[in-house]
Amino acid sequence: TGAGKSVCYQISALLLRGVTIVISPLISLMKDQVEALRQVGIPAAYVNSSITQEEFYHTVQMVQQGQCRILYVAPERLMTDSFFRLTQQVPVSMIAVDEAHCVSQWGQDFRQSYLDIPVFMEQLPARPICTAFTATATKQVEADIARILKLQEPEIIHTGFDRKNLFFGVRRPNNKTRELFQLLRENDGKSGIVYCSTRKAVEEVCDALRENGFPATRYHAGLSDTERAQNQDDFLYDRQPIMVATNAFGMGIDKSNVSFVIHYNMPMDLESYYQEAGRAGRDGSPAQCILLYSGKDVRTNDFLLQRSRETTEVEDEETRQFLLEQGKERLKQMTFYATSTTCLRHRMLQYFGDHSPDSCGNCSCCLTNYREEDATTAAKKIISCVYRAQKGGYHLSRTMTADVLMGSKKESLLRMRLDQLSTYGIIEKLSRREVMQLIDELIQREDLALRQFQEYQELVLTAGSVEIIRDQKTVMRRVPVVREKLAAPVGTKDPTLSAADNDLFQKLRQLRAAQAKHEG
């Protein structure tokens, strides 16, 4: 993310004869990149569902007359008769597949239409050079891309996933809105993005920020094209330095001075989180990437995964089930990151197959003091609760298990007669949050597992559960010595400015905004 993937195929296109076809799933990104190329004198165009038939014919004429060097196209248009005829009439020098992870069922954003790409290339008069680009491919996805696109002994270039100027942090606040306010005060006068998982959350968070004096705007697919464009410009030119948005915002946005990215809700997978967080600090300056986590995020994402299974364009039932299972596995890895007590950067880089030290010194886990605590007794109580619930015919989720162990008086729990279990209320020395954290740690260690049951995931026992009960394994957990305090990223100073410095800072912001507008 932000490493210059687009430049790779744009410069290559200028060195080749004929037209370069860039396959991209993002209509807004096509428009932005074509406009940027035209501003520097490079003839480019795009073909997608947003253009009229007249505009398409005009684009065809440009390509036929050699007046277009780079043609962006949506994957859905590749196999249409009109586009096929065009590609038979002009020399295609290169195919550039952007967001190439979309071709793989192992990827976080599989698109059925991407499977048309190898078929399309086979129908061309001569097979052109094929290049593929992605910011978020695991080793498995990388191999899948090469196989599906039929790349013969491809040159594979890794720029690495580590962005050393980014500080990664996770907070688990009781009140996310209050925590967000505090983070924004710590970054007063700076530009940043607040990501939310739903349109409703975007509206609520943006309204709350405005009501409390924060200069915020919003972006999601439910807004009109005009409003989205206006809000995007307000953010790019620092008229509204805080953008509250769904993941519909940010792809291809070239704004270098984003000082923070805050995730108000946890994304579905580490690929999405890395890509969205990576929009911070593109100028190389220290920047913060903060995740505000709660257990509710897991339940929300699990619901969204189930819903996506029903709305996917994939018709084959077996493939749909496979995609759902892959989504659940990615959500599990994302949850492991959010609940980790070890280096966040190491966990993320390890997921993508990058080597890294066990400790980076620039994440909230590395900068928090922990002590080791024997939690075997509490773990046995959790495992016993799951066992006795299953024996009684119950299917308990993570939260239901914690409620039983804490002796909750919730009406739903009492109605199910869960208070009759012998493990009801047997944990007294831990808070509910600590019980939930220990459950998550047991899942990470594979001493418990999650299994789909109806509309939610239930806890089930594993071989590790038996080992703990039989005293063949101990459970040690890391406990913060003091309440986690988010340290400033490496290289930053106290954010408080004097009156004179603040006046100068505001003038510099105005100057930068004017320059950005002038340069387009």
Name each model-derived stretch.
Residues 322-354:
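Short, charged low-complexity linear segments at domain edges
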Residues 125, 253, 340, 392-393, ...:
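Helix-turn-helix/winged-helix DNA-binding modules
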Residues 299-300, 311-317, 326-328, 344-346, ...:
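Accessory DNA-binding and partner-docking regions appended to nucleic-acid-acting proteins
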Residues 147, 211, 336, 510-514:
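A generic structural signal for well-ordered alpha-helical segments enriched in polar/charged residues
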Residues 120, 145, 348, 512-515:
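Broad structural signal for hydrophobic residues in well-ordered alpha-helices, predominantly aliphatic
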Residues 1-6, 12-21, 28-318, 329, ...:
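Helicase motor core with emphasis on the C-terminal RecA-like subdomain
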